[in-house]
Swiss-Prot record:
The chain crosses the membrane at residues 465-484. It is found in: Peroxisome membrane. GO terms for molecular function: alcohol-forming long-chain fatty acyl-CoA reductase activity; alcohol-forming very long-chain fatty acyl-CoA reductase activity. PANTHER family: FATTY ACYL-COA REDUCTASE 2, MALE STERILITY PROTEIN 2-RELATED. It comes from Mus musculus (Mouse). Residues 485-515 are peroxisomal. Catalyzes the reduction of saturated but not unsaturated C16 or C18 fatty acyl-CoA to fatty alcohols. A lower activity can be observed with shorter fatty acyl-CoA substrates. Can produce very long-chain and ultra long-chain FAls, regardless of whether they have a straight or branched chain. It may play a role in the production of ether lipids/plasmalogens and wax monoesters which synthesis requires fatty alcohols as substrates. It comes from the Eukaryota. The gene is Far2. Its main location: membrane. This is Fatty acyl-CoA reductase 2. Disruption phenotype: In the knockout, the meibum lipids do not melt at body temperature, resulting in plugging of the meibomian gland orifices and the typical evaporative dry eye phenotype. It catalyses: a long-chain fatty acyl-CoA + 2 NADPH + 2 H(+) = a long-chain primary fatty alcohol + 2 NADP(+) + CoA; hexadecanoyl-CoA + 2 NADPH + 2 H(+) = hexadecan-1-ol + 2 NADP(+) + CoA; octadecanoyl-CoA + 2 NADPH + 2 H(+) = octadecan-1-ol + 2 NADP(+) + CoA; a very long-chain fatty acyl-CoA + 2 NADPH + 2 H(+) = a very long-chain primary fatty alcohol + 2 NADP(+) + CoA. Its EC number is 1.2.1.84. It is a single-pass membrane protein.
């Protein structure tokens, strides 16, 4: 029997960020492997027109929880939603709910964060730093708490090329940053943001680094650990391959490529695509919770959940497999035939963004206007290019993460636990994973039926014919404008045609000679 699964039986668990991608998969795995756990508290932000219980039912009614309902039919009774807002002081939780959390919680998984790369520094500090500080304060008042697991990111120290399993200092103390956010106005914060984040690419990575320091400084006597995942992608194995429900990371790129919106991207083809399946991150996180509670390490251990140093895959290989899979199972209503090229220079990137992205969008918007519809393609394309520009830093660099603690933890698990909570990324078959990823994007994100594949292929053939027709027409126009009006151009043209004719004639004659 799994020791880890048995450990979580009869436990009361608090999960922040449970309505997010990682949080949902974490909750599903806990219920599926430990159906006898006592309760999972989830902090849910109030939403107008929807009760907390309705939001829980919405989560449970997704395909992700189908297997859970078989092993834990009363799962809805074991989820206790608590109205909370991490943007508010003390999370705006009622006194009754606070008292219940303080007296009952055994394990905390802190998954909540803002993952927006362009978030204002005030917002990023509130969700990634201040909220962590407040949760630690609450945790310090929980007499039954056994472990506090903080989910950070492997890119919290992306300004370094080699990252160890340690917490790196920041020039300005987190407490000073938190205090300054309370009285500085937005314009001043925007002005000082570049100086604060330094050589990090955005406020997300900077504030996640601050959050780690807060965990180290303010955890007191708590048993704490930090998990640092890299780019979190679709499920690898559990509860089934390819499940994904957000546009973050590779998912948005796959859709943009498959729909024909994205034809060129600035990236280093041989750079490591450090994507990690979400179920791998979840299995490691659950194992870390068990190890931290049972073995009570003397210091805060950091665990890297990354793939590049153990089972690397580069962006070129990933791109080829994405295109090969899309050719077999194309997306419906594609804007253009799927194709994607890597560029490495700024000039080439700007050129293709204009010629291959914005100009076709403008032409399509003109067509929409002619047919009496609202133009939208250029606006959509500009949003896409802005998103891509924020990802460029991560697809043009490679990092090395040490994984000593992760490998140590794997060796501590029994064979049964290694099977049930598998986070050994060395077993991952990238070609198979990427194919399932693309299929999952089609089924779970785009909600497209596989029965529509023949029609989608027919649509792509139509787009191919339009492409050939357009190129032919463009060639004839250029010929008419340049060659037909210039004697020199005609001479060059006739020379090329004559040369090609003679070459073909020579090739045919030589191929008939008998040796």
């Amino acid at each position: 029997m799994s020791m880890i699964a048995a450990f979580y039986s009869n436990k009361s668990i608090l999960i922040t960020g449970a309505t997010g991608f990682l949080g949902k998969v974490l909750m599903e795995k806990l219920f599926r492997t430990s159906p006898h756990l006592k309760v999972i508290y989830i902090l849910v932000r109030p939403k107008s027109g929807q009760t907390l219980q309705e939001r829980v039912f919405q989560i449970l009614n997704s395909k992700l929880f189908e297997k859970v309902k078989e092993v834990c039919p009363n799962v809805h009774e074991k989820i206790r939603p608590i109205s909370a807002d991490l943007n508010q002081r003390d999370f705006a939780i009622s006194k009754e709910d606070v008292q219940e959390l303080l007296s009952c919680t055994n394990i905390i998984f802190h998954c909540a964060a803002t993952v927006r790369f362009d978030a204002h520094l005030r917002e990023a500090v509130q969700l990634n730093v201040t909220a962590t500080q407040q949760l630690l304060l609450m945790a310090s008042q929980m007499p039954k708490l056994e472990a506090f697991i903080h989910i950070s990111t492997a890119f919290s120290n992306c300004n370094l090329s080699h990252i160890d399993e340690v917490i790196y200092p920041c020039p300005v103390e987190p407490r000073k940053i938190i205090d300054s956010m309370e009285w500085l106005d937005d314009s001043i914060i925007e002005e000082i943001t570049p100086k604060l984040i330094g050589d990090r690419p955005n406020t997300y990575t900077y504030t996640k680094a601050l959050g780690e320091i807060v965990v180290q400084q303010e955890s007191g006597n708590l048993n704490v650990a930090i998990v640092r995942p890299s780019i979190v992608g679709a499920t690898w194995q559990e509860p089934f391959p390819g499940w994904v429900d957000n546009l973050n990371g590779p998912s948005g790129l796959i859709i943009a490529t498959g729909k024909g919106f994205l034809r060129s991207i600035k990236a280093t083809p041989m750079a490591v695509a450090d994507v990690i399946p979400v179920d791998t991150v979840v299995n490691l996180t659950i194992a870390v919770g068990w190890y931290t509670a049972v073995h009570r390490p003397k210091s805060t251990l950091i665990y890297h959940s990354t793939s590049g140093n153990l089972n690397p895959c580069n962006w070129y290989k990933m791109g080829l497999q994405v295109l090969a899979t899309i050719e077999k199972i194309p997306f419906e209503s594609a804007f253009r035939r799927p194709n994607a090229d890597f560029t490495t220079s700024n000039f080439t990137t700007h050129y293709w963004n204009t010629v291959s992205h914005r100009v076709p969008a403008i032409i399509y918007d003109f067509y929409l206007r002619l047919t009496g519809r609202k133009p939208r393609m250029l606006k959509l394309m500009n949003r896409l290019l802005k998103t891509i520009s924020m990802l460029e830093y991560f697809i043009n660099h490679s990092w090395e993460w040490s994984t000593n603690n992760t490998e140590m933890l794997l060796s501590e698990l029994s064979p049964e636990d290694q099977r049930v909570f598998n986070f050994d990324v060395r077993q991952l078959n990238w070609l198979e994973y990427i194919e399932n990823y693309v299929l999952g994007v089609k089924k779970y994100l785009l909600k497209e039926d596989l029965a529509g594949i023949p029609k989608a292929k027919q649509h792509l053939r139509r787009l191919r014919n339009i492409h050939y027709l357009f190129n032919t027409a463009l060639f004839l126009i250029i010929w008419r404008l340049l060659i037909a009006r210039s004697q020199m151009a005609r001479n060059v043209w006739f020379f090329i045609v004559s040369f090609c004719y003679k070459f073909i004639s020579y090739f045919r004659a030589s191929s008939t000679l008998k040796v």
